Amino acid sequence: MEKYEKLEKVGEGTYGKVYKALEKSTGQVVALKKTRLEMDEEGVPPTALREVSLLQMLSQSLYVVRLLSVEHVDCAKNGKPLLYLVFEYLDTDLKKFIDSHRKGPNPRPLPPQQIQSFLFQLCKGVSHCHAHGVLHRDLKPQNLLLDKDKGVLKIADLGLARAFTVPLKSYTHEIVTLSYRAPEVLLGSSHYSTAVDMSSVGCIFAEMVRRQALFPGDSEFQQLLHIFRLLGTPSDEQWPGVSSLRDWHVYPQWEPQNSAPAVPSLGPDGLDLLTKTLKYDPADRISAKAALDHPYFDTLDKSQF
């Protein structure tokens, strides 16, 4: 790792520690992700190789953080080599951007054109992942990095991504920050699809408009109460099979509310798109690809993307 000079630790990702670093030969600032995936006697474990090849494939999109290289390092501590992933570096994320508009010296709404542009780029990135058979499963504002000068948004931290080309694989539950978690995951469904990411996209969209989480639960139960209070408690007619999901019968039966007051500055097209991302039945939820053609984006200059 002599090639890089670590400047500061900038976080803990799904992979492990993340550092801001300088590539000495070029002067380029990069993000170094030290993976927890230690190599075994055979070399790099197949899971790590799969993850890396997936990241390389996905980072061909402008809207996914680019993986620049992979470095093998001999670790003196236990003699096991480590794997560092070298990514392009972006200095802020959507959470910090929203927070800067909510608090601080100059609280103000995000400009509608900015929301439109960020959402379009997010849908482009998600559509790219889905087209390559990958669910992100942990989309949240902290995982959406921004190049503020260029107005570009990029999806990061695909550490929980799994190829979903194996149909209806039983996935593990422990994923996704609660506020962006899809109802089928919260209700314990172990079979899910690309629709889980679109539910997160809807929550992120609403948060850009509101500057605070749409469903700010601190437990799975609380999270579902927030969702059901606004969208109504789903029925088997709306969402076939929902009543057979875990803990279903403990929830009060609420009627759906008008969502408009929750996102007061959003026009009819925006509200329609939001509603389509938050549909209960995953099969009815709008796809990322279809979202790109939604009338909400008609006033956006798409030639720039």
Swiss-Prot record:
UniProt-listed Pfam families: Pkinase
Cellular-component GO terms for this entry: cyclin-dependent protein kinase holoenzyme complex; cytoplasm; nucleus
Phosphothreonine found at: T14, T172
Residues modified to Phosphotyrosine: Y15
Keyword Transferase: yes
PROSITE patterns with a match to the protein in the record: PROTEIN_KINASE_ATP, PROTEIN_KINASE_DOM, PROTEIN_KINASE_ST
Protein name (Swiss-Prot/TrEMBL): Cell division control protein 2 homolog C
Listed Gene3D superfamilies: Phosphorylase Kinase, domain 1, Transferase(Phosphotransferase) domain 1
Keyword tags: ATP-binding, Cell cycle, Cell division, Kinase, Mitosis, Nucleotide-binding, Phosphoprotein, Serine/threonine-protein kinase, Transferase
Name of the gene encoding the protein in the UniProt record: CDC2C
Reaction equation(s) it catalyzes: L-seryl-[protein] + ATP = O-phospho-L-seryl-[protein] + ADP + H(+); L-threonyl-[protein] + ATP = O-phospho-L-threonyl-[protein] + ADP + H(+); [DNA-directed RNA polymerase] + ATP = phospho-[DNA-directed RNA polymerase] + ADP + H(+)
GO terms (BP aspect): cell division; G1/S transition of mitotic cell cycle; regulation of G2/M transition of mitotic cell cycle; signal transduction
